[in-house]
């Protein structure tokens, strides 16, 4: 099936949209990086307006791993919201991925950088990992929990409902467009790289002409 995709060429001016979770009404404010048409529907590659957050568990050996979903009870989430609020950070229960905002984010030091490790579903010994900043730490039912700001770019897929409003697609819809969406995201990020190169060239030119 043919997929027709379009990348926002001006990545610094990506349109702001909302990703809606069917059944709950919860919303995730996003910017749209790219879109494609598939079987009469429009799908978008979206990235959150606010910083993406994940909850992690600290193991006895010091490793940080994502918290299992069955442990993410309303009581635990409420405790995480309270721990973040004490640091002037608002933890948002947004769909697909939790997010955070607030002045306290600017006070997070680089020393709080940790590695978050993901188990490999294929059984490979080499686990995936990414850098994350610790926003808050707490104990809940004898469990050491950390609220982490993940640093790698995060993209989610939405299906257009109406202008500026997307909804979380079904698993079948996601499977149908995932590969093309990933390709469009690569093109979008390459646009960011080109803009950075142009900015650096401009700075160097200014220095060359400095009296």
What are these regions (language model features)?
Residues 1-211:
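General detector of folded, globular domains
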